[in-house]
A protein has these predicted regions:
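Domain-level signal for Mg2+-assisted phosphodiester chemistry and nucleotide/NA-binding surfaces
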Residues: 1-122, 135-136, 140, 189, ...
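Nuclease catalytic cores that cleave nucleic-acid phosphodiester bonds
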Residues: 104-239
């Protein structure tokens, strides 16, 4: 049964950095485990191995603009940032992997700045004023565009063209639900891999199962062994 694995790159990178924080900017390692964890889905619980159709990795090129920080006035070249170098190297490494297709969206072309949610809360509650903000508390306000659309189109295309019998999606939100419904109506087995993160309430009714093939983040490993008094997001085995 041909299986396609679709990976939301932004989500994957966040979870990868929770699982292997010491490799946060190791692009080669990120590409290696993305491929490995995707391939791990091909092994059936009974020992049967499915055929791989393709691995799709969705992301955006990194921010490469030069921007002036509105507080310090310093010109920052974001093309030389750790994040930009990591993303560029990751994309190149993925292109070299067998049966991996890189799908790139784009970033919004706005030259605005923002700050963290906690800082916003403090500003709204009057605990701080805008005059208190420091230069290092600001970051460019950029958003991905076209990634969710590409995921939805590919899910629909794979299902309608009968190219696969199973779709594995590594993601963590409910944006894909309409496409998942279509795929299931076409007889496709739709499995979500949230990489051991909790999933939105009510999502289970729109998918055929949940399975994570990556290691648990360290704090979840401890909780799973009963060392921490916190709940572990439940997962449903998928075959």
């Amino acid at each position: 049964m041909p299986t396609a694995v679709l990976i939301d790159g932004g989500y994957f990178i966040k979870r990868f950095r929770r699982i292997e924080p010491h490799n946060a900017y190791n692009a080669q390692r990120a590409a290696e485990v993305a491929h490995r964890w995707a391939i791990a889905h091909l092994k059936h619980a009974s020992g049967e191995r499915r055929d791989l159709y393709r691995i799709f990795f969705y992301d955006c090129p990194p921010l490469r603009k030069k921007m002036h920080n509105p507080i310090s006035g310093l010109c920052i070249d974001y093309s030389r940032s750790d994040e930009a170098l990591f993303r560029t190297s990751l994309h190149e490494a993925l292109k070299q992997k067998r049966k991996v297709a890189l799908r790139l969206g784009h970033l919004t072309d706005f030259s605005s700045w923002t700050t963290g949610s906690r800082t916003f809360d403090d500003l709204l509650k009057g605990k701080r004023t805008f005059g208190d903000l420091q230069a290092d508390e600001l970051q460019p306000n950029v958003r991905q565009k076209g990634v969710d659309m590409r995921i939805g189109i590919d899910i629909s295309s794979l299902a309608l063209k009968r190219q696969v019998r199973q779709i594995i999606l590594m993601a963590g939100d409910a944006d894909f639900v309409p496409a998942a419904k279509l795929a299931r109506r076409e007889g496709v087995d739709f499995v979500l891999d949230p990489m051991w993160s909790s999933i939105p309430k009510g999502l289970m009714e729109h998918i055929d199962g949940v399975r994570s093939t990556c290691p648990r983040p360290l704090e979840q490993q401890r909780a799973h062994r009963g060392q921490l008094p916190c709940a572990i997001p439940g997962t449903t085995s998928a075959t």
